[in-house]
Structures are given as structure tokens and as C-alpha cells.
């Protein structure tokens, strides 16, 4: 397994709409393992394939307290939403930034597992929010898109300064 490089805002590749996975191959399964390792290495609770510059509809999530229950969602679709919720979200692709994002309180999801078998589940609380956040990535959308233009601009400027500093050192 390998830790993958996570793209950071404002990288245009994060705006790519992911394509469906046609066939779950051994290469896709290895890539999923790398995504899970990357998510844990970055101390995240979710990671979409687009965040690591692979533009297919794959998401990994682990909101468990023990950090040992990864969920794999291939070609996920939210089939139903209800209620209103929202928390101050962060993102591995927007390091150091947080913002309040409105989300549905409950979602129903259908996806394929890592072996290509279809399954469905209902989610609420943090899992529902995380699913919505990661599926946004598959559509080329980031949590900063929900923020005011001024806050988004400030976050972008801050991350660009950090990037320039890191490139010099």
C-alpha cells in the first residue's frame, strides 16, 4: 500500500467531475487500499478519489471512534435526503480551514462495495454529513463553495501563501 498525494485547493483538478467505475478490477481494489491508507495517514474521516487525482467515483469513509471500520463506496448515489443539519466542516484538500455547511440530517445511499457488490444503507449524524461532503468531491464541488465569496477568497490566499512558502523551503 502507498500514501497518495492529496490535492489542495485551489488546484483545478479538484473541480473535475468523476466518471463511474465500469468494472471493479484488482487495480481498483489496490487503489482503494491506498486511499484508505492515505485517509488514515492524513487523519481524515473521508477521502474521494478526485482528491488524489483519480477521477472515478470512489469514496472511502471511516467515522468510527476506533478508526478501523473503513467503508468503501464505489459509484455512490444518494437516493433520499431528509432533515436539516450542518457542522463546521474541514477538508484534507483545504488544510487548516473550516466552515459551516448546510447538509441533510439523514441520507439513504446505494453503492458498490470493494468487490463490486451493490448495497444500500441509511446514514445520519456525522456519517450522513461525511457522505454528502465526499460525494460533493465527486461532482467537483468543495465545502468552500458553500461559504461566502470573501471567506473563500481568504482561504485561497492563505493556502497559496503556504504553498509558496513550502516551495521556497
From Swiss-Prot:
Binds 1 Fe(2+) ion. InterPro entries: Peptide_deformylase, Peptide_deformylase_sf. Its EC number is 3.5.1.88. It catalyses: N-terminal N-formyl-L-methionyl-[peptide] + H2O = N-terminal L-methionyl-[peptide] + formate. Keywords: Hydrolase, Iron, Metal-binding, Protein biosynthesis. Its cofactor is Fe(2+). One of its GO terms (molecular function) is peptide deformylase activity. GO terms for biological process: co-translational protein modification; translation. Transmembrane segments: none annotated. It holds the Pfam family Pep_deformylase. CDD domains: Pep_deformylase. Fe cation binds at residues 91, 133, 137. NCBIfam families: pept_deformyl, PRK00150.1-3. Removes the formyl group from the N-terminal Met of newly synthesized proteins. Requires at least a dipeptide for an efficient rate of reaction. N-terminal L-methionine is a prerequisite for activity but the enzyme has broad specificity at other positions. This is Peptide deformylase. The lineage of its organism: Bacteria, Pseudomonadati, Pseudomonadota, Gammaproteobacteria, Vibrionales. The gene is def.
